[in-house]
Amino acid sequence: MQNGLRRRVAGQITLSALVVVGVIYMFASLQRQLIYFPQVEPEDKLLRVAAAAGLQPWRDSSDALIGWHTESANDQSKRVLVFHGNAGYALHRDYYAAGFLAQGQYWDVYLFEYPGYGARTGAPSEVDIKAAARHALELLLSHDARPVYLVGESLGSGVASYLASQFPEQVAGMLLVTPFTSLTDVASHHYRFLPVGALLSERYDAQEALSHYRGPVAFLLAGSDEIVPTPLGQTLYEGYPG
């Protein structure tokens, strides 16, 4: 009888261990599907959407689409580069362009598109998004010496913070909307039973990045955000050394 009990207990432990290992494996292998929710559309459709919003396609020297922009007629205008959240595509955030342009002919607004989102080719990952964002900023900086400001929304706050750490002299200031300390901290909040720190490849460590930037930063936190816990944004704000 005791041997039978031992076998049942051992079987339950083995089954539980297999379930845990399976969950960990699924999280590790599917993490990008849990982070990125791109909406893909044909470029001709997005060209019509952009035109209705007063935006033009933004392309690099090889004519590849990297986002959307609207330019003022004022050659003294400032430039703002916007990084959206993890879902949809850049044109879903055309309200940023409308908001800046409502102030008058003072801003050239650029809505950056992530690889694999909208009509942009590629697939989203932290490495590829950061590389593409760096290329976009370098493209703007190569045109002229006007100031460039960054706006980062949710996931985009991690991208903007990274760029500020890499170009601390060229980034004139930032607005971070519903930001977080790191994606690892966000994931740890939602998956407390998993060793997220050891599994997550996409980290977007905004807190570490901001330690290398001293320019002006405005933080806009949500009172009850179900995705990005407000305390993470508060921690980022309180720890910012600039």
Predicted regions and their residues:
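Gly/Ala-rich beta-loop-alpha elbow adjacent to hydrolase catalytic centers
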Residues: 152-156, 160
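Active-site nucleophile loop of the alpha/beta-hydrolase fold
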Residues: 175-185, 202-206
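An N-terminal hydrophobic leader/cap segment in hydrolases
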Residues: 12-59
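Membrane-embedded segments
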Residues: 64-139, 143
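Active-site nucleophile elbow and catalytic-triad environment of alpha/beta-hydrolase enzymes
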Residues: 195-209, 214-215
